[in-house]
Amino acid sequence: MENIISLLALKNDPTSATTGAGLVAVGAGLASIGNFGTGLGQGLSAGRAAEAVGRNPEAIKKIRSLMIIGMAISESASLYSFIIAILLVFVY
């Protein structure tokens, strides 16, 4: 915890501008990791939906609607992490 506090103190120090910029870049990179999980989850969801349609073609409308709802919910996490990364880069 002391390391985090000392890093925050370095960020606010005007003489260490490069340290602050580096911390912002690291934070934006960590926020972008959220996009990895979303892409993986959406790919698995689409694959399972294609499998389900292959096994039961009559249920394509229900499967498609459930898949779209699930992808929209998982996409919201990706959008939040993207917005945080953009805010870190352009605001700080």
UniProtKB/Swiss-Prot annotation:
What keywords sit in the KW lines?
ATP synthesis, Cell membrane, CF(0), Hydrogen ion transport, Ion transport, Lipid-binding, Membrane, Transmembrane, Transmembrane helix, Transport
Identify the CDD domains for this entry. Answer: ATP-synt_Fo_c_NaATPase
Q: Which superkingdom does the taxonomy of this entry point to?
A: Bacteria
Any Pfam family the entry gives: ATP-synt_C
The record's subcellular locations are: Cell membrane
The name this protein carries in UniProt is ATP synthase subunit c
As for membrane topology, the entry says: Multi-pass membrane protein
> InterPro entries from the entry?
ATP_synth_csu_bac/chlpt, ATP_synth_F0_csu, ATP_synth_F0_csu_DDCD_BS, ATPase_proteolipid_c-like_dom, F/V-ATP_Csub_sf
The organism named in the record is Mycoplasmopsis pulmonis (strain UAB CTIP) (Mycoplasma pulmonis)
Q: Chief subcellular site?
A: membrane
- Subunit relationships: F-type ATPases have 2 components, F(1) - the catalytic core - and F(0) - the membrane proton channel. F(1) has five subunits: alpha(3), beta(3), gamma(1), delta(1), epsilon(1). F(0) has three main subunits: a(1), b(2) and c(10-14). The alpha and beta chains form an alternating ring which encloses part of the gamma chain. F(1) is attached to F(0) by a central stalk formed by the gamma and epsilon chains, while a peripheral stalk is formed by the delta and b chains.
One GO CC annotation: proton-transporting ATP synthase complex
Check the record and name the SUPFAM superfamilies matching this protein: F1F0 ATP synthase subunit C
- Site described as Reversibly protonated during proton transport, located at E75
Q: Which GO terms describe its molecular function?
A: lipid binding; proton-transporting ATP synthase activity, rotational mechanism
Q: Where are the transmembrane segments?
A: 20-40, 71-91
Function per UniProt:
F(1)F(0) ATP synthase produces ATP from ADP in the presence of a proton or sodium gradient. F-type ATPases consist of two structural domains, F(1) containing the extramembraneous catalytic core and F(0) containing the membrane proton channel, linked together by a central stalk and a peripheral stalk. During catalysis, ATP synthesis in the catalytic domain of F(1) is coupled via a rotary mechanism of the central stalk subunits to proton translocation. Key component of the F(0) channel; it plays a direct role in translocation across the membrane. A homomeric c-ring of between 10-14 subunits forms the central stalk rotor element with the F(1) delta and epsilon subunits.
